[in-house]
Amino acid sequence: TPDDMARLAIGGQRVSADAVEKWKIERGYDKPLFLNVKQEGVKKYTETIFYQRSVPLLTFDFGASDEGRDIGREIKARMWPSLALAVPTFVLGLALSIVFSLVLVFFRTTALDFWGVVVCVVMLSISSLFYIIAGQWLFSKILRLVPYSGFAGGWDTLKFLALPIVVAVIAGLGSEARFLRSLFLEEIGKDYVRTARAKGLSERVVLFKHVLRNALLPILTGAVASLPLLFMGSLISESFFGIPGLGSYTLDALSGQDFSIVRAMVFLGSSLYIVGLIMADISYTLADPRVRFE
């Protein structure tokens, strides 16, 4: 309730009613949630918490946080550190997963394929927190190659982002490679592959030229759908590595009970998710001429 939010923000349960009421008035929480029966006409609906705090989000007017800071300005400032981490992680992770899964498919029914699948299952079974802690222990404490955490501008950004990117790529390799391996194995059983082999093409050419090209359609649509969400950052990685992105911004808002920020980030994430789905449908029609909108 707004009263609980006020007590949490002020600090403590033994807060005077006047202090609680003052906090609610300053932040617009002194009004009813959906319907204000004390008003007349349109004001019954406009003089409410929902209208004044949620409806402006439709025009991407995020307003101010409960501490009085401009949320829109914070999002613009924190968007770039999130992208600096998310874009290389996404590109490198996808490329490495494709190469690794193709190698497993090339050596299918061999010991290499078997142990590769075992490694993938083990990797996807381990929590991402383990990779973060292990990476900080190995590369920062033992080898002293990169800092534990932090962020800086310019070329110094590389040394602060190197460890988070490596950890994120390794953490997602197991699940992505396992999925892509199944996708490539399904393609190998199709008629065009048998036709290519009957023409005398080598297994390497069949796999890397024909199978990969035809399997790129679902990979492309999945990648395009994920692109808008890169702006949202990573909650865990940014918090552990001290990166001032949108992920850590959201997590700090949750821990600080700043529901204005949480509301804005949920709306932004939902909007980007919808944009991603639309982009995936469009890319599907562009990549496959047989598919058309009706």
Language-model-derived ranges and their functions:
Residues R7, L33-L35, F62-D66, I132, ...:
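Short, hydrophobic secondary-structure boundary micro-motifs
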Residues T1-P2, V118-P147, V167-G172, R178:
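Membrane-water interface segments at the C-terminal ends of transmembrane alpha-helices
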Residues M79-L112, S128, A152-E294:
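Alpha-helical transmembrane segments of integral membrane proteins
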Residues T1-Y45, L143-F160:
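Hydrophobic alpha-helical transmembrane segments of membrane transport/permease proteins
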Residues A6, V20, V119, Q136, ...:
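Generic structural marker for isolated residues within well-ordered, non-membrane alpha-helices
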Residues P32-I98:
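An internal, D/E-rich "acidic patch" concept
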Residues T1, A9, Q13-R14, R27, ...:
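Hydrophobic aliphatic residues
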Residues A19, W23, R27, T46-F62, ...:
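Hydrophobic alpha-helical segments of integral membrane proteins
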